[in-house]
Amino acid sequence: MSGLYSPGFSPARNLSPQIRSNPTDVDSQYLAELLAEHQKLGPFMQVLPICSKLLSQEIMRVSSIVHNHGFGDFDRHRFRSPSPMSSPNPRSNRSGNGFSPWNGLHQERLGFPQGTSMDWQGAPPSPSSHVVKKILRLDVPVDSYPNFNFVGRILGPRGNSLKRVEASTGCRVFIRGKGSIKDPGKEDKLRGKPGYEHLSDPLHILIEAEFPASIIDARLRHAQEVIEELLKPVDESQDFYKRQQLRELAMLNSTLREDSPHPGSVSPFSNGGMKRAKTGQ
């Protein structure tokens, strides 16, 4: 996204009448910045739900402006407050872990519930400005490669590799199915309980994207390509990605030993260590 993000651009900057700037281009640039912010916020959406909601609403608003041509519409949208769109909690209608074992895409309309399809000045939003949610399932080839540590490769030290994937794609990634919980004994106890139905399925990855309808498929495809690349087994002698993870783990362990008042009391596999934060939810 670095090619789209322009640090010098300010959405609050007024256009001078003497400057022949294309307002659609200006707002397109602002939309690109909003999407870049959405990417950066990805790993923190759970702890900053209000920020995520407000950012999604602004993305919807600006997407609508970009698709309206002409200075009249642009000025009417530009110098007003964001429309007070209500956005339902995307997780309010989930039961258990919120996912059922299926292949393909699940789509959910957000932000424009029935009865609020017009903004506060009466302008209908562009259909492509709707923020939608899609979930894609990718099966992990554990049957073909039973000895390959797919989960560790995706998670990385303390889940950092997974966090970077989420930050770079703007999508959330969940590891589900048999083998998604580190402790096999705990997994056996949880299997079949409400919220853990997925443990009866083969190991799989869920990619969740939440973007305007006009771009969500492209973003989801990008995330799919990144995950599929990680799911390709590599010979250990040629696995540069794993070597990078091991170096990162060594650095984290060294930092922990220096910071801990009781050397050896902190392990990267303890609660503060190699967590499988995206499993068993």
Swiss-Prot record:
<feature type="region of interest" description="Disordered">
    <location>
        <begin position="77"/>
        <end position="126"/>
    </location>
</feature>
<dbReference type="InterPro" id="IPR004087">
    <property type="entry name" value="KH_dom"/>
</dbReference>
<dbReference type="InterPro" id="IPR045071">
    <property type="entry name" value="BBP-like"/>
</dbReference>
<keyword id="KW-0238">DNA-binding</keyword>
<dbReference type="Pfam" id="PF22675">
    <property type="entry name" value="KH-I_KHDC4-BBP"/>
</dbReference>
<keyword id="KW-0832">Ubl conjugation</keyword>
<dbReference type="Pfam" id="PF16544">
    <property type="entry name" value="STAR_dimer"/>
</dbReference>
<dbReference type="GO" id="GO:0005634">
    <property type="term" value="C:nucleus"/>
</dbReference>
<dbReference type="GO" id="GO:0048577">
    <property type="term" value="P:negative regulation of short-day photoperiodism, flowering"/>
</dbReference>
<dbReference type="InterPro" id="IPR032377">
    <property type="entry name" value="STAR_dimer"/>
</dbReference>
<feature type="region of interest" description="Disordered">
    <location>
        <begin position="1"/>
        <end position="22"/>
    </location>
</feature>
<keyword id="KW-0694">RNA-binding</keyword>
<dbReference type="GO" id="GO:0048579">
    <property type="term" value="P:negative regulation of long-day photoperiodism, flowering"/>
</dbReference>
<feature type="compositionally biased region" description="Polar residues">
    <location>
        <begin position="13"/>
        <end position="22"/>
    </location>
</feature>
<dbReference type="GO" id="GO:0003729">
    <property type="term" value="F:mRNA binding"/>
</dbReference>
<keyword id="KW-0539">Nucleus</keyword>
<dbReference type="InterPro" id="IPR055256">
    <property type="entry name" value="KH_1_KHDC4/BBP-like"/>
</dbReference>
<feature type="compositionally biased region" description="Low complexity">
    <location>
        <begin position="81"/>
        <end position="95"/>
    </location>
</feature>
<keyword id="KW-0287">Flowering</keyword>
<comment type="subunit">
    <text>Interacts (via N-terminus) with SPL11.</text>
</comment>
<dbReference type="InterPro" id="IPR036612">
    <property type="entry name" value="KH_dom_type_1_sf"/>
</dbReference>
<dbReference type="GO" id="GO:0048024">
    <property type="term" value="P:regulation of mRNA splicing, via spliceosome"/>
</dbReference>
<dbReference type="GO" id="GO:0003677">
    <property type="term" value="F:DNA binding"/>
</dbReference>
<comment type="function">
    <text>Involved in flowering time control. Binds DNA and RNA in vitro.</text>
</comment>
<feature type="region of interest" description="Disordered">
    <location>
        <begin position="255"/>
        <end position="281"/>
    </location>
</feature>
<dbReference type="GO" id="GO:0003723">
    <property type="term" value="F:RNA binding"/>
</dbReference>
<dbReference type="GO" id="GO:0009908">
    <property type="term" value="P:flower development"/>
</dbReference>
<feature type="domain" description="KH">
    <location>
        <begin position="139"/>
        <end position="205"/>
    </location>
</feature>
<protein>
    <recommendedName>
        <fullName>KH domain-containing protein SPIN1</fullName>
    </recommendedName>
</protein>
